[in-house]
Amino acid sequence: MRAASNAGLDLVGLTDHDTTAGWDEAAASLSALPTRLGLILGAEISARTDKHISVHLLGLLFDRANTELSQALANTRDDRIPRMHEMIRRLRGAGIEVTFADVEQHVAIGATLGRPHLADALVALQIVENRSAAFDQFLNNNSPFYVSHISPNPINAIKLVKAAGGIAILAHPGALARGECVDESAIAAMAEVGLDALEVDHRDHDEATRAQLRGLARALGLLITGSSDFHGSGKLNDLGENQTSVVVWDELLARAWGTEVIYA
């Protein structure tokens, strides 16, 4: 939160993967900041299509007391432990000496175990230079070391977020460097069940991809957002890059009823 304040942001979204564990700590930190910062509570929900394509859905301002959504997030978190063990087994089979204990050192209390922690372990072991390199070389969706985990279908994930009063945004839908992306017909199906927006302005989208996604969003009646996808010092993304316009945010905010933006 302090980094967001120092970057001059008015609003920042907290969307850890498949968890709301950081909400209270983040909200409590606002009063000590040098500037007035609004906190948008949410989660980045891991989903998977029937064609086994990984999809990330940003759920914002939902009611975390909603039982069905909370259980779906818990199911995904629980499956990440055996998944991590299998990824490590595959890496070690290729001669890459990393252990589960190495990964655990990079997982904060309450955090959702995931590939970023494995990436940080590879950096600490000097196997790669940074987290982005770890994903490029070993951890992307097309890698032989990649292992999937239990995830809701994106259609169901959107329905869960909307039923909990939240906003549903399809994250980095054209980030081909991460792996196969859903096609326009799949996005149209998501729009039919309540998807609010496409995250168009993102570091992983070139100008041609952004133009294509803007056209698709207009055709489907979806709003257009931007995001830094900031993950801390381990990732090259700058906090505050690729922002969402005030006009778009105000329209999204008007659709949410699960929880409110938090101010100190």
PLM regions: where:
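An N-terminally biased module of ancient metal coordination in phosphate/nucleic-acid-related enzymes
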Residues: M1-H52, L139-N140, P152, I158-K159, ...
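Mid-domain alpha/beta scaffold segments of enzyme catalytic cores
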Residues: H17-P82, E86-V107, T112-H117
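Active-site gating loops and adjacent loop-to-helix segments of metal-dependent hydrolytic enzymes
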Residues: R48-I81, D120, A124-S143, G240-I262
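Short hydrophobic/aromatic-rich motifs at helix boundaries and adjacent loops
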Residues: G59-L61, R92, V128-N130, I158, ...
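Short coil/turn linker and secondary-structure boundary residues
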Residues: R64, V98, L113, P152, ...
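Conserved acidic, metal-coordinating active-site core of Asp-based
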Residues: A108-A175
